[in-house]
Amino acid sequence: MTVVPVKLNELKNKLVIIDQTLLPNEEKFLELDNPEEIWEAIKKLRVRGAPAIGIAAAFGLYVSTLKSKAANVAQFKKEFEEVRDYFATSRPTAVNLFWALKRMTRRFEQEEDKTVDKIKQALLDESEKIFAEDQEMSKAIGKHGLSLLKPGMGLLTHCNAGGLASSGYGTALAPIYLGHEKGYNFKVYADETRPLLQGARLTTYELYKAGIDVTLICDDMASLVMKEGKIDAVLVGCDRVAANGDTANKIGTSGLAVLAKEYGIPMYILGPTSTIDLDASTGEDIKIELRDEEEVVNGFGRRTALKGVKAYNPAFDVTDAKYITAIITEKGIVMQPYKESLKKLFE
């Protein structure tokens, strides 16, 4: 990826994002510096993907509080916490959002005995660390993931977990980018990913621009391409992983996992350890975001169902751990039993 989808413009003190709702037809960058704009950008998926949401929240918290005229630390902390809590209401399922906000809060508390200006500088430092760590994380995930793949493989991915979802290679697409650099000549199949078409609009956009062999398929074609022997592995990202390995990801992931198991195809979940939530015992503890039903009935620029027809629009589903071959993180590859192997990542 040559486009960095989320970054900080230090000269202007603004969060800069590429508006992903306009891709692939228009590349428009937005410069944001107030809480309402940043909340809206996260909620409306102008910036999306678990790692990118965390980065946007961190930089957003910094630029939103930078303009504070608070005369003392107590007042500044009150303003900081108001913005933090507001951001936390934007997307309930992606744990990286809360992880980043907690990191920024922890850094604030570590510097609480300093001046307001010193605390602001510390918040800048922490947000830049989160950005830099994400870049290194994606490279490490790519390296570990590539160790499970062979040249010429057919790979299926869902939604978008590439450079547009992070500050680097991404997660699920990281091994594909790394393999491309090494001449692996993968054949990638991307689900269009209804209802918002992140696979069609975003994944094919970035892979095609990178010169990677990518073929777009409708979501309901996945079973056929598996049966035809075109798929050797399924690679997807994750928004939250429970302690037992149950994984929340874009709606449709669970169905792919069931199909992959039936056809004997490995199902790989790729994501940073920051997406692992050991406080969630199982997938039942993960709150699933419900989005506006208009996204379903107006999905192609015009209404596709009669007015008055109801639509159900959960943004994510949970894949049971029994369908997951391995979870690939920046710290390494973990397999069943996930309750033990995931816990070891944090020891």
Swiss-Prot record:
<dbReference type="InterPro" id="IPR005251">
    <property type="entry name" value="IF-M1Pi"/>
</dbReference>
<comment type="pathway">
    <text>Carbohydrate degradation.</text>
</comment>
<feature type="site" description="Transition state stabilizer">
    <location>
        <position position="159"/>
    </location>
</feature>
<dbReference type="InterPro" id="IPR037171">
    <property type="entry name" value="NagB/RpiA_transferase-like"/>
</dbReference>
<feature type="binding site">
    <location>
        <position position="198"/>
    </location>
    <ligand>
        <name>substrate</name>
    </ligand>
</feature>
<comment type="similarity">
    <text>Belongs to the EIF-2B alpha/beta/delta subunits family. DrdI subfamily.</text>
</comment>
<dbReference type="InterPro" id="IPR011559">
    <property type="entry name" value="Initiation_fac_2B_a/b/d"/>
</dbReference>
<dbReference type="Pfam" id="PF01008">
    <property type="entry name" value="IF-2B"/>
</dbReference>
<protein>
    <recommendedName>
        <fullName>5-deoxyribose 1-phosphate isomerase</fullName>
        <ecNumber>5.3.1.-</ecNumber>
    </recommendedName>
</protein>
<dbReference type="InterPro" id="IPR000649">
    <property type="entry name" value="IF-2B-related"/>
</dbReference>
<comment type="function">
    <text>Catalyzes the isomerization of 5-deoxy-alpha-D-ribose 1-phosphate to 5-deoxy-D-ribulose 1-phosphate, as part of a 5-deoxyribose salvage pathway that recycles this toxic radical SAM enzyme by-product to mainstream metabolites.</text>
</comment>
<dbReference type="GO" id="GO:0019509">
    <property type="term" value="P:L-methionine salvage from methylthioadenosine"/>
</dbReference>
<dbReference type="GO" id="GO:0046523">
    <property type="term" value="F:S-methyl-5-thioribose-1-phosphate isomerase activity"/>
</dbReference>
<dbReference type="InterPro" id="IPR043679">
    <property type="entry name" value="Deoxyribose1P_isomerase_DrdI"/>
</dbReference>
<dbReference type="InterPro" id="IPR027363">
    <property type="entry name" value="M1Pi_N"/>
</dbReference>
<feature type="binding site">
    <location>
        <begin position="48"/>
        <end position="50"/>
    </location>
    <ligand>
        <name>substrate</name>
    </ligand>
</feature>
<dbReference type="InterPro" id="IPR042529">
    <property type="entry name" value="IF_2B-like_C"/>
</dbReference>
<feature type="active site" description="Proton donor">
    <location>
        <position position="239"/>
    </location>
</feature>
<dbReference type="GO" id="GO:0019323">
    <property type="term" value="P:pentose catabolic process"/>
</dbReference>
<keyword id="KW-0119">Carbohydrate metabolism</keyword>
<feature type="binding site">
    <location>
        <begin position="249"/>
        <end position="250"/>
    </location>
    <ligand>
        <name>substrate</name>
    </ligand>
</feature>
<keyword id="KW-0413">Isomerase</keyword>
<feature type="binding site">
    <location>
        <position position="91"/>
    </location>
    <ligand>
        <name>substrate</name>
    </ligand>
</feature>
